[in-house]
From Swiss-Prot:
Its EC number is 4.1.1.5. This is Alpha-acetolactate decarboxylase. Keywords: Acetoin biosynthesis, Decarboxylase, Lyase. It comes from Raoultella terrigena. One of its GO terms (biological process) is acetoin biosynthetic process. Converts acetolactate into acetoin, which can be excreted by the cells. This may be a mechanism for controlling the internal pH of cells in the stationary stage. It holds the Pfam family AAL_decarboxy. It catalyses: (2S)-2-acetolactate + H(+) = (R)-acetoin + CO2. The gene is budA. Belongs to the alpha-acetolactate decarboxylase family.
Amino acid sequence: MNHYPECTCQESLCETVRGFSAHHPDSVIYQTSLMSALLSGVYEGSTTIADLLTHGDFGLGTFNELDGELIAFSSEVYQLRADGSARKARADQKTPFAVMTWFRPQYRKTFDHPVSRQQLHDVIDQQIPSDNLFCALHIDGHFRHAHTRTVPRQTPPYRAMTDVLDDQPVFRFNQRKGTLVGFRTPQHMQGLNVAGYHEHFITDDRQGGGHLLDYQLDSGVLTFGEIHKLMIDLPADSAFLQADLHPDNLDAAIRAVEN
């Protein structure tokens, strides 16, 4: 039987519940390529969706040619497209950048009142205060609003991602049930991944979603856990090998494209 000790969290949001995984093996984050490569326009990879699912049942990323956002949970992968729609991804589709794990949450918190994105993050940060660890988080619930963007499909010659997002479509899903998948990445990993919180959303009918810019949860269940291990597959193609992976404006550029 799992033991669920109580803890106190800021502004009585609390009783974050220690959960599920005292006896589970350590989770590992699997990542294909680098965020800095995506930022510089490396939009084609050789890793398939089928490959990703051998490394985890939960994650996020994008698709070749930057054709929308990727969200994965319960071993199902969806493509969140530039028109705001969503569809199930094919096993043979490929990704230039994705992050996956076997989701083994350690904590659970039920919300029966509205909370902001920042308040949700505060719950996680208080329970796992060290910024030197990865966290994976999942929410199933009713969202008062979910403000998203997606990236439009690109064609060669590829522009840098900061230029692509000048054309990004944005959407607002109001009063919708849905699923959030996200990671909190340490600041020292900026460039390898996206430092801070990176979250994707899909509606419960699996017909729409995107990369989250902001949201408010009316009610739902948050599960999350810390991850201590990271494995990265680096591409060997010429686009990656010739890319500038550490430009002077790396941190500012990533913050601009993600937020």
